[in-house]
Amino acid sequence: DTLPRKHIVPYGLGDWCPPGGNETIDCPIALSSTAFHYFDVSIMEKVANLLKKTEDVYYFNSLKKSIYTAFVAEFYDMKNKTFGSQTADAMALDFGLVPKGDEGAVSKAIAKNMEEKYDNFLHIGIFGLGRIGEALSRYGNGKKAWELFTKTGENSFAYMWTDAEATTLR
């Protein structure tokens, strides 16, 4: 933990390949990097527990709590219940970085972002893509997830299959 600054990791590659290219990434690099840092520390805590390394369990648990606190303080808009973008909200939900009780509201913030900013389409890159469906459906927005996955037109899953011939979906 010598590289992060006050438990925030300020560098990384970010949420690559959103619609419009990497210059349109709207999930802050520090947010995605810090979320992965939290995830990695969570894994280390589990490994230490399996190995019965009590001191390491305590260390990683304490570090995880510090990262969580810093993450929420740095990135969470408590008033609007969002981390600011579809990917940011989906990652926070997936990694358990949303304040307890706010999960449904953060999921709704994803749907609201899609509706208000992106004409009901995704605006996510590689980190959001695998998380967006569960972030919507697990927390009461299954209808929005269904609409998203069955929508047609550019920047849709149907477009990736039929027109873009995206091999990653096959």
Question: For each of these PLM feature ranges, what is it?
Answer:
Residues 1-170:
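Active-site core of glycosidic bond-cleaving carbohydrate-active enzymes
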